[in-house]
């Protein structure tokens, strides 16, 4: 396709400033990987201003295991702020069997990882205090201080400069054309790369993507939250909100928490005691994490019902899990300063960055007042804005740019006709399917694949293998094939109830040969839920160890990224307070099959079901009674 004059001029300029001779970089073995080779290049800090100095850009190359690479994939991590080298294990797992003929390159974006680092203490060391009142906004002030510390380089960390760096690395490696995979913010950067360097890109995969000109109010996120609450309920026969409006039930819960916040002792994912204070803004924060922690969708309806019945434990646990992140840690693993520098340079703002801080704040306030009352349903405006979940006001005090504008998409740059695959989970709030459709429509040769029952980013932790397989085939053929599995991705099994004890629990269903009585059937239901609950916690537990809802511990073994089986060992795990479950559980992640041998009270049973279907769990075994023959247990439990 012939570029128009403005775009051609931009493309020529970009080619001049990023070109590097092949073989112009020295590669050395990486200290923590026997096969990877590490290197660095030096690039201009500001390509339009030679006096601005230089920056160091670090990268890794993983060769094709079969020797000769038929293709090279450049993988770009999300954030902003996370280094791509830190997620290399995820990208290698994604390539899987394709690694034999595929090389992988990961480049740490300027500002993070082993590249020229932004380690901005006001942000990096910011005390973790979510949901501060709007009037205080201490994080906004920390962002302003960080911008001031960066000085004349505060506008030197934009996405455009970062992807120019990546192309410079590929040129130095002698790879003139390559495939690109970007996840989350990495897909934003990948769009910028292909718009600035279309001739370098062989094919493009955008996973969990959003438009460069997204809505800065993030209203798409709330629309998806409402639809996801409805969809997860409709798809799970055990959802207690199936006959209600889930969005309205969430709104009712928010109003109740606003009137009387929940304060209770709970436990974090590792089982450590934590004090939870949950108000309406806190609930907004919990639900904002649901596309990354699907247990929130799984548990919320039943947890809300339990809270209404006077039991705060399930809801408090969701809050403890959602807010367990804590402080930022070292900047090389996540640079909060880079996050702010990118957002204040590239992201659409709710005010003009040419205005003064006072003027920016006035424009933001006016925009908020102009929104309809239900703009952030199921939350009202003050709840959602006050939850401080989006970067609405981060850039109020960010310095004005001192160099020529360098937006991610150069003026006049057209979306190229390059084979493009766009993946998005239908439960993804932060990079919604609404935005993904807009992105796909802009690329002339694109295929959009919605992935059912999946949250944020579909292919990196894809235990069923559907999205990952689509990506691998796409890189091999540059065509989206075998996509039907995306619509069949298994639904979540929502919790039916959180009874405090087995006395108020639902009963398991007797099958042929069962000799149980009602109390044993209720205990069996509790035992099955204890096993399912431990599996649901697996993605969030630290150090492979977690706690039961009402007591007990469990451990998990099995590499997170290899998609092999996970073995869980339960010791006194209590979903219901009076049913302590111990035993061994094997969960086959690729098939969803669960097999358990457990004991609780006088019962010894086996338990089997699949997370990939809605078929009930089958429980077989016996219960001993003092002085009496064993009672045969032959029961089923709705898919836990």
Stretches with model-predicted labels:
Residues 235-348:
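Alpha/beta-hydrolase-fold enzymes
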Residues 10, 23-24, 28-41, 103, ...:
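Solvent-exposed, charged interface segments at domain starts and junctions
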Residues 2-24:
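Secretory targeting and sorting signals
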Residues 25-282, 347, 351-640:
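Gly/Pro-rich cap/lid or specificity-loop segments adjacent to the active site
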């Amino acid at each position: 396709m012939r570029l128009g004059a403005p775009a051609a001029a931009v493309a020529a300029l970009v080619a001049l400033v990023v070109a590097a001779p092949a073989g112009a970089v020295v590669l050395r073995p990486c200290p923590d990987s026997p096969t990877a080779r590490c290197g660095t290049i030096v690039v201009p800090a500001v390509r339009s201003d030679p006096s601005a100095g230089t920056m160091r850009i670090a990268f890794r190359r993983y060769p094709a295991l079969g020797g000769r690479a038929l293709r090279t994939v450049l993988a770009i991590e999300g954030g902003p702020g996370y280094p791509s080298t830190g997620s290399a294990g995820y990208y290698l797992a994604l390539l899987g069997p394709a690694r034999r003929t595929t090389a992988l390159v990961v480049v740490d974006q300027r500002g993070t990882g082993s590249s020229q680092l932004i380690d901005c203490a006001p942000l990096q060391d910011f005390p973790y205090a979510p949901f501060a009142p709007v009037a205080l906004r201490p994080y906004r002030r920390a962002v302003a201080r960080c911008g001031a510390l960066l000085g004349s380089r505060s506008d030197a960390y934009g996405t455009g400069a970062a992807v120019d760096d990546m192309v410079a690395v590929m040129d130095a490696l002698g790879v003139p054309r390559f495939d690109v995979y970007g996840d989350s913010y990495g897909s934003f950067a990948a769009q910028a790369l292909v718009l600035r360097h279309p001739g370098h890109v062989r094919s493009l995969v955008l996973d969990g993507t959003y438009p460069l000109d997204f809505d800065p109010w993030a209203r798409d996120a709330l629309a998806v939250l409402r639809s996801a609450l409805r969809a997860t309920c409709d798809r799970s026969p055990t959802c207690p909100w199936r006959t209600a409006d889930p969005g309205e039930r969430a709104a009712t819960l928010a109003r109740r928490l606003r009137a009387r916040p929940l304060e209770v002792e709970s436990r974090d994912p590792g089982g450590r005691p934590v004090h939870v204070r949950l108000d309406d803004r806190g609930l907004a924060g919990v639900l904002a994490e649901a596309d990354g922690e699907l247990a929130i969708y799984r548990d919320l309806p039943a947890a809300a019902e339990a809270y209404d019945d006077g039991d705060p434990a399930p809801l408090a646990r969701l809050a403890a899990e959602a807010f367990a992140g804590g402080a930022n840690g070292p900047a090389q693993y996540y640079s909060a300063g880079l996050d702010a520098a990118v957002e204040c340079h590239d992201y659409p703002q709710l005010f003009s960055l040419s205005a003064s801080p006072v003027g920016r704040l006035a424009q933001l306030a006016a925009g908020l007042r102009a929104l309809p009352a239900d703009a952030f349903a199921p939350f009202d405006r003050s709840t959602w804005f006050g939850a401080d979940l989006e970067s609405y006001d981060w850039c109020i005090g960010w310095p004005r740019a001192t160099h020529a504008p360098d937006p991610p998409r150069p003026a006049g740059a057209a979306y190229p006709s390059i084979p493009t695959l766009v993946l998005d989970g239908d439960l993804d709030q932060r990079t919604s399917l609404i935005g993904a459709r807009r992105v796909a429509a802009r690329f002339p040769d694109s295929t959009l694949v919605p992935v059912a029952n999946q949250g944020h980013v579909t292919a990196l932790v894809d235990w069923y293998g559907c999205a990952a397989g689509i990506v691998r085939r796409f890189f091999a053929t540059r065509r989206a094939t075998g996509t039907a599995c995306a619509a069949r991705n298994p639904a979540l099994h929502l919790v039916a109830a959180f009874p405090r004890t087995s006395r108020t629990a639902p009963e398991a269903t007797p099958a042929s040969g069962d000799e149980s009585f009602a109390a044993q059937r209720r205990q069996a239901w509790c035992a099955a839920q204890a096993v399912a609950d431990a599996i649901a916690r697996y993605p969030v537990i630290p150090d492979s160890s977690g706690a039961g809802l009402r007591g007990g511990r469990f451990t998990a073994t099995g590499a997170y990224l290899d998609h092999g089986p996970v073995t869980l060992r339960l010791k006194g795990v209590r979903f219901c307070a009076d049913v302590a479950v111990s035993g061994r559980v094997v969960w086959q992640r690729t098939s969803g099959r669960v097999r358990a041998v457990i004991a609780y009270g006088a019962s010894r049973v086996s338990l089997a079901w699949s997370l990939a279907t809605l078929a009930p769990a089958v429980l077989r075994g016996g219960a001993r009674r003092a002085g009496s023959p064993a009672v045969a247990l032959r029961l089923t439990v709705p898919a836990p």
